[in-house]
Amino acid sequence: MSDNKFIIGSEEWCAFPALGVPAIKARVDSGARTSSIHAVNIRPFKREGEPWVSFELHPIQNSRKIILRCESKVIDRRNIKSSNGEIEKRYVIASVIQLGGHAWEVELTLTNRDSMGYRMLLGREAMSNKTLVDPSESFCLGQQNDVEVEQLYGVKSAKKSGLKIGLLASNPDLYSNRRIIEAGEQRGHEMVFLNIKQCYLKLDASEPEVHYRGGRILNDLDAVIPRIRPSMTFYGCALTRHFESLNIMALNTSDAITRSRDKLFSLQLLQKNNLDIPTSGFANSPVDTKDLIDMVGGAPLIVKLLEGTQGKGVVLAETTKAAESVINAFKSLHVNLLVQEFIKEAQGKDLRCFVIDGKVVASIERTAAPGEFRANIHQGGSASIVSVSAAERQLALKAAKTMGLRVAGVDIIRSSRGPLLLEINSSPGLEGIESATGIDIAGAMIDSIEKKLGWKAE
């Protein structure tokens, strides 16, 4: 045996000081060419113009008690054939390995090893001219028990860092945005306000990126909370979609937001799923105005711009003549609109149910200001806490599920034939409902992200 080689067994404890890994159990396999280490939430980014990668490592098999956040320079991307014969393109990093009293630099590919028996595989390239393998032995360089390993990680697990969450919006001073930032920071997370207009995309099959004005790359986020104003729907959803392609969790997905923002499409989806809505009509030509009015039971009726929110672009036409004038005026501007039956018995009131993760976490009754028929808070309406019926609760939950929204403000109106769905909002305001109920809605939104990402405070 050469003097500079040492014997290792079929499994050994390794360390990677540069990655902050004091102990990780490795399967030693001279039949495998490359070495790999467990990595999840792998995200490429640039540092001083060079390619780097960030990733999370759970160093103990079958345990998420310890989570390490690692960064390393990328030296390559390679197609690696896994043990099941599948080809996977992996990032390759280099780091110094410590085995017993020996240390040298090895190359590691990053991959999810949750389905494997070991968090690390030590292949023959890493062992070349360094070791001899005795497959009949284990832990030739020393065994460590669970208590010893947890003690090695004690400082890191006690000081576990929070998540990095981006708030994708337009105005940092709005009540809702301030509350979300505040709620995240109170829970120990790093909250980053991202102005939608200052984000831009790099479309690249191997290195997609989201940039922020000034050159900062945003690929290192754990999650984004899209709060997209209607005028920014197209670009905001494109940004959200790009974050999703980087395996960054979106509290509401781009597809769900797109569905909910298209009022006609959303009503069609609700109708398809047998959810009750006010009778509505849609036509392309002013020639069909009279039939459209008759379709919803005649005047009085509601005329809605498809692009409107917060009660804007909604008109009550009290007579047939007024309805014809409003519809034809809107059509002359080449805008899309809906006509909808007017629910007189609601008396200027509606319900807002706030849904998070399939639960109605809060509900309020909104009442229109004197002389106004719209109950929206932004139109001067008032809010009061209300207890909703089981039917109303189920309607709200089914509506959010139909849209695919994890977080939704569902508007319901009480009619003589039962509760009817008015609208599902993917960026519902927090001020009215938090003020009326005293419930920490912003905190519940952060809780949803923590639950989805499996994050728990120590």
Curated annotation (Swiss-Prot):
Entry keyword annotation includes Glycosyltransferase: no
This enzyme's EC code(s): 6.3.2.-
One Gene Ontology biological process: SOS response
Binding positions for Mn(2+) 2 per the UniProt entry: 423, 425
Stretch list, region Unknown: 1-162
Cofactor list: Mg(2+); Mn(2+)
TM region(s), chain numbering: none
Binding site for Mn(2+) 1: 411, 423
Residues where ATP binds: 304, 341-342, 350, 374-376
One annotated Gene Ontology cellular component of this protein: cytoplasm
Cofactor note: Binds 2 magnesium or manganese ions per subunit.
Binding-site list for Mg(2+) 2: 423, 425
Limits of the ATP-grasp domain: 267-450
A Pfam family this chain is assigned to: RimK
Region entry Alpha-L-glutamate ligase, spans: 163-458
Binding site for Mg(2+) 1: 411, 423
Record's keyword terms, sorted: ATP-binding, Ligase, Magnesium, Manganese, Metal-binding, Nucleotide-binding, Protein biosynthesis
One term of GO molecular function: ribosomal S6-glutamic acid ligase activity
InterPro entries assigned to the protein according to its UniProt record, in alphabetical order: ATP-grasp (IPR011761), ATP-grasp_RimK-type (IPR013651), ATP_grasp_subdomain_1 (IPR013815), Peptidase_aspartic_dom_sf (IPR021109), Put_Zn_protease (IPR008503), RimK (IPR023533), Rimk_N (IPR041107), Rp_bS6_RimK/Lys_biosynth_LsyX (IPR004666)
Family, as annotated: In the C-terminal section; belongs to the RimK family.
PANTHER family: RIBOSOMAL PROTEIN BS6--L-GLUTAMATE LIGASE (PTHR21621:SF7), RIBOSOMAL PROTEIN S6 MODIFICATION PROTEIN (PTHR21621)
Annotated protein name in UniProt: Probable alpha-L-glutamate ligase
Lineage of origin: Bacteria, Pseudomonadati, Pseudomonadota, Gammaproteobacteria, Alteromonadales
Gene name linked to the record: rimK
